[in-house]
């Protein structure tokens, strides 16, 4: 399952930084759940699988809580360090995430979680490009 692979890869890539972990795991991956869950719920509803709809609705509400907590802690850390949360989030994503932060976005549920559009619009992670170019990484000698 590619989504789980991406989640675990991001967990490894952000292991050394709480800010990066909160930004990438909670405010990118889990926020993406806010975007895709409503369409998934609707597909199950159209198929008549109301039991799955109920479960997915609970999961969706839980996802809003995860993003809210991630946003709260990320913002708190940034305030303690005297840095701008939006600029810091965008920097963390550019440096430690691979690929675009994809829409369409569920702006209403992202806003409920505290994430305004300034966080995620027109944002692309460059981690894979940086790794391939060796930018920001120590070169390792191969024996």
Regions found by a protein language model. Give the residues of each.
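Non-heme di-metal
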Residues: 1-143
């Amino acid at each position: 399952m590619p989504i789980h692979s991406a989640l675990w890869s991001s967990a490894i890539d952000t292991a050394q930084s709480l800010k990066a972990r909160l930004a990438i795991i909670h405010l990118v991956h889990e926020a993406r759940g806010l975007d895709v869950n409503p369409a998934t719920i609707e597909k199950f509803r159209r198929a008549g699988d109301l039991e799955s709809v109920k479960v997915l609705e609970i999961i969706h509400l839980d996802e809003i809580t995860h993003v809210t907590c991630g946003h709260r802690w990320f913002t708190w850390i940034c305030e303690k360090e005297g840095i701008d949360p939006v600029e810091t989030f965008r920097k963390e994503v550019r440096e430690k995430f691979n690929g675009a932060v994809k829409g369409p976005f569920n702006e209403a549920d992202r806003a409920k979680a505290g994430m305004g559009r300034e966080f995620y619009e027109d944002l692309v992670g460059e981690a894979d490009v940086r790794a391939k170019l060796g930018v920001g990484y120590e070169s390792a000698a191969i024996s």
